[in-house]
Amino acid sequence: MASSLAPATKAATNLRLTHSLRFSPKPNNLRFATKPGNTLLCTRVKAQLNEVALDSSSNATSPPMKAKSKEEPPAKPLAEPSSSVLATQESVSQFITQVASLVKLVDSRDIVELKLKQHDVEVTIRKKEAMPQPPPAPQPSVVYSPPPPALPPPPVPASTPAPTLARATPTPTSAPAVKSAKSSLPPLKSPMAGTFYRSPAPGEPSFVKVGDKVKKGQVVCIIEAMKLMNEIEADQSGTIVEIVAEDAKSVSVDTPLFVIQP
């Protein structure tokens, strides 16, 4: 060991340091034995260097010595997510899936409100009907005003009695006596029902008139029945004293037509 350290000790005396050195406060003494009976005192030097350059003045140059740098500790691998974190993420995912399925359930069923609580999370699902509705707007108050009193109707003027015209009573004449005399005679009666005509055609003179003398079998009028013109003849000879039936009027069977005085 002494023979191997001798060249190193000799070379150390001719070294030139290119960097600052930090000496320990209490250097430790090392003893190297070169020859029997001789001792060499050398001081151990601690240098905080990355690299030391050596320069020798002798012909024999020694190779540069490299100080061993402190090895950096290997980078720690990223910590893998713990099982508790994975379990939490998985539970949250399952919880969200459950909430989505519950929303579909509430929409498809007659459910107004649903509450779900799992661990420290609570979810409330409400339909629109369950949400608090805003208070209705106050309706405007209607003030009722009574209608104005109706005006009294105007007084009705007293109706004046209409003047009555005094009918002049006709003075009795001898006509009633004549009529009574005619009424005693048997009249010429209608043998059928129909329409009584005094003339053969409109606008022509009548067959007979009051005061005319007629003979038995003479045509005195026409009665229209069933669209047929039926001539009516006098039942006796005499004077026409009265025409009882009205022209162009309906007559029935045995209706008096004329009064003939023999």
UniProtKB/Swiss-Prot annotation:
Main location: plastid
GO molecular function per UniProt: acetyl-CoA carboxylase activity
Subcellular location: Plastid, Chloroplast
InterPro entries: 2-oxoacid_dehydrogenase (IPR050537), AcCoA_biotinCC (IPR001249), Biotin_BS (IPR001882), Biotin_lipoyl (IPR000089), Single_hybrid_motif (IPR011053)
Signal peptide region: none
Annotated region (Disordered), positions in chain: 53-84, 125-185
SUPFAM superfamilies listed in its UniProt record: Single hybrid motif
Residues with the N6-biotinyllysine modification: K227
Targeting presequence: 1-47
Function of the protein: This protein is a component of the acetyl coenzyme A carboxylase complex; first, biotin carboxylase catalyzes the carboxylation of the carrier protein and then the transcarboxylase transfers the carboxyl group to form malonyl-CoA.
Protein name: Biotin carboxyl carrier protein of acetyl-CoA carboxylase, chloroplastic
Organism whose genome encodes this protein: Glycine max
Gene that this polypeptide is encoded by: ACCB-1
